Amino acid sequence: ILTEFCLSQYNLDTDKIDWIEDAKLCILIHWGIYSVNGISESWSFFNEYISYDDYMKQLDGFTASNYNPNDWVKLIKESGAKYTVITSKHHDGFALWKSKHGNLNSFSNSKSKKDVLTPFVKAVKKNGLKLGLYFSLPDWSYKDYTNHTTNIKRYNIKDSPERWSVFQKYMFYQLDELSENFNPDLWWFDGDWEHKSEDWNVEKIKTKLLAKNPNVIFNSRLNGNGDYETPEIGIPVLRPESRY
């Protein structure tokens, strides 16, 4: 599990984001099959440091046998954090919940045979913390997504719009599942750099998720169409002029 500490340094007027300005500290949890061998999440096979087949062998080691979401949330709360974000699905396409869409999730495809996201969400809400869900826009495992590895591209959207349409339906099905089942306070998207805003259909994404929760917050990784910025790799020395 890779845990990151996120400092909130925003100064926004919108009422819905007041809580995140006051929260200051977030615990962002990366958890997936990459935890089995302790290798880079998704990028290890995308950049071909390891073969895709070897990467997926980690499914057999993902047992979640020592998983105790209540202990996790207790530790998060003791840290002083007021909200937490967890990877519902990273770029490798491995979903932590029992998704009815796609063919790669912890319940159906891993040794654990568990939906590991639901008990974590329940523990977060029971303890009065705000919930954020990380969701990768790219899905490098899905057969109708454009990219598989840095050297393997399945197709171009312009040449095969019908395949992109299939992927879009799959993506929206999964977003609907997460929205309906967990109703997060924050959506933490990632991977927007692979395609343009209109290709991702960012406005539709936001409209659908806001219909479920008008007060939900979006990070900036919807091609800049979010409520706050999320720099990566380092913490700025000076407060950014943009929303952060």
Outline where the language-model segments fall.
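Mature catalytic domains of secreted/periplasmic carbohydrate-active enzymes
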Residues: L7-Y244
